[in-house]
Amino acid sequence: MKGKKAAIALAAIMGFGAVASLGACGGSGGSGEIDFWYSASVPDGRIISEMIDAYNNGQGKEDGVHVTGDNRGSVSRTDLMVNSPNVIMLSDEQFKQFAVEDYYLDLTQYYEEMPGNYKEEEIPTSFTRAFRIDTKDDANGKRMAGEGAAIQGIPFGVDPMIYYYSIDVFEEAGIKIISCEEKDLEKKYPGLQPHGYAEYTAENGAKPPVEGATVSENLAGESVYKIFNNLIPMNFEEFRYLSKCFTKSYTDNDSTTDYGSATHHWFSFGWSVGGDCVGYDGEKYSFTALDSSANYLVTAKDGVTVNGKHYAAGEVVRYEDKVKQADIATMQGLHPLPSQQTAMQEFINLSVPRDKTGGMVATGYGVATAINESVDALYSASNKVAMVSGRIVQTTTLEVAYKGQYDIALPTQWREYKGGSVYYKGEETFGNEYLKVIGKQYAGTVYTGELDKDAESGVPFVGRQTGYGSFSALMIPVNSDSSNYEAAWKFIRWAASEEGQRIYIKTGNVPNQSALALSDEYAAIGSGLNYRAAAIAAQGAEIGDWAYFNNGAWVDKWSGNFNQALRLGYTTPEKFMQDFAGIANTDIGKVSIVMNGRW
């Protein structure tokens, strides 16, 4: 193993074959017989086999390459040490732990010299960034990952976070469900504003804003038209209000569900405003799960330069740049967004009960369950919910017993509306909080439900549209047959191109190609389900905290307390940070990886 790595390094130093375009990368002249190891369910395995057959009978003949697939339960370190397969498929969670041990071939030169039909510019940056990591530490002992780092894996697809919701529960509440992207809303539904969930007044003879909407009563006892758009994210206020509408303790037990929602991961809350559980200050990472500093949205038409980095209009400033720009709070062309602490508190409040019982020290909204957060919470006998977060491939589970009874929507997003989203009847508590009704007056002004925007540039005050995704990628183990490196690359570039991805989408995973993901072809894979939402969610998806560094072990020591004691009201955010910030910082201090380009 060491001898083979040394030979590869020596060849790179001496630049062997640099004058030959296709031969420059090395690894040519082998048999062309490629072993491809992957892990997939039986149905997905059949689809991957179909993809392999398509390559062998098509592009593979032109490439002089033949691929044999092997659906294995898992790939271990041992498999990468000796007699490795020519190509492997791994998840983002596995990727970095083997990368820092030098088990992958650097694919940068292969991509630069023989990309075939695989083009990074056709793929979301977060996909490609997830599998870039340098092959050695820099002078400061840091291993750079992300933008600008070496290509060690080629993104193969993603299983993004989405929300499942019960169609029956929504319709019983009088909610009209539509599917319309924000860019098409004005043309297709001129009477609507860009909301995930909104209520329009039905009083004084007001007509429905969309055909098919019916009059029903909202939580405040008003006659309204309720509209749910599953292709526009709900903002924080809309999500908690709609969850409240489906929580028995707020509806005199009139709700058919115990809770409004179940959301296990905080990512779409914190990431949307520009926060994260870690922050890099240019020298080291710190545990920032409850960081109280404001975040910033760029609103200047021509962008703004912060800490030497230029940001375009609509982008959110990264943690490193905001903490190193001393005067950021007074800079022109920036709009403040909530802190990570505010976003995280919003997420925590969803599941913390509204009343203290049995040793609880905190209260919250109490509109979500933190006990059962799997997709079957939609239809469970206890802790039944109206909405539950999950991933798109979990439709397989729901289709078995609940076909036609549920659909898919986007994760939450920070979105600001003119005049705000809520009002209070009496004291400003969540129990007295209600969603503003479009068309009604508040403090003498008619609420229009319009997005709030910068007065000069027109940039809307919205955060990132994001959530976590479970990414997969294709790699060439460095300890595989080096004479077949080029053959292995030719298969990878085809499988990750539109032609290969067109077959792979049959698994339900969102393809890496944005155009294909957002096409009617992928949407049709859902057989009536709103797969368009999954495709949109995937465009802003990021790796979860378990995949930030060498492995997810650094999360384990604090995540249990976070998901149990903190989210159930048995501890406070302040006590959580007292108990776990030091532990998390110690573990983070042991990692050498720096995620370049990530906030």
Predicted regions: what they are:
Residues Y164-I167, S470-S483:
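A bilobed periplasmic-binding-protein/Venus flytrap-type ligand-binding module shared by bacterial periplasmic
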Residues Y38-G45, V65-N140, P155-I167, N230-R240, ...:
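Ligand-binding clamshell of periplasmic/extracellular solute-binding protein-like
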Residues D92-I162, D168, C180, D184, ...:
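Hinge/lid segment of periplasmic solute-binding proteins
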Residues T507-P511, L529-G589:
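C-terminal capping/gating helix-and-loop segments adjacent to ligand/active sites or protein-protein/ligand interfaces
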Residues I492-A517:
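Periplasmic-binding protein-like
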Residues F236, R240-T247, D281-I371, L398-V400, ...:
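Glycine-centered hinge/linker elements that transmit conformational signals in sensory
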Residues G3-A11, G15-Y103, E112-E120, N140-G141, ...:
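Conserved N-terminal structural module of periplasmic/extracytoplasmic solute-binding proteins
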Residues D138-F156, K188-I328, S374-D376:
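Extracytoplasmic/periplasmic solute-binding protein
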